Amino acid sequence: MEYSFSDEQEQFRAVVQRFMRDKSPMTEVRRLMTTKDGFDRDLWMQSCDDLGLAGLHVPEAYGGSGFGFVEVGIVAEEMGRSLLCSPYLGSSILATSVILHAGSEEQKRDLLPDLIAGKTVACLAFAEASGHWNSDGVELTALQSGKDVLLNGKKKFVLDGCAAD
């Protein structure tokens, strides 16, 4: 089976590649690796504004572009090529996907716009200290407190957890 990208996807790749090349020189990557967040929030918001990176796979009904995971993969490939420091995988792909698939309509309307705009960084915490991946090993507890839910426990390997809002 042979696969090739459409002309539109190749044009998108070229735009993303140019942005990454211009905005992510190796000296900047090294500098950002020593910062608290590990990425430049202003540059992240610019990538969301100019290229719509954070909302690529989010349906248009929620403010996204409505593209698929092929376009997400194009961005990931170009980010890997340039080593752009960003919360793309943790916030824009993992967290938004969980919200899209498990969130209520109210949660989607409330949470997705700021994630898509790059104003908010989210993370997904699912790995248990035990290393088990099934529901039997979950040690986290949730307690309803009025309208809020209080979470208690520990998670490991939380991608972008240090920068999440």
Regions found by a protein language model. Name each.
Residues 1-89, 110, 114:
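Amphipathic, small/basic residue-rich leader segments at the start of a protein or domain
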Residues 4, 57, 94, 125, ...:
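Conserved beta-strand segments that form the floor/walls of ligand-binding pockets within enzyme
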Residues 13, 20, 80, 99-102, ...:
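Generic helix-packing signal
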Residues 19-23, 98, 122-123:
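Short alpha-helical functional segments enriched in proximate histidine and acidic residues
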Residues 65, 106-165:
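Glycine-rich, Trp-frequent "lid" loop and neighboring beta-strands that shape
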Residues 67-68, 97-100, 135-136:
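Short, conserved acidic/polar surface loops in the N-terminal third of protein domains
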Residues 87-106:
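N-terminal glycine-rich flavin-associated loop
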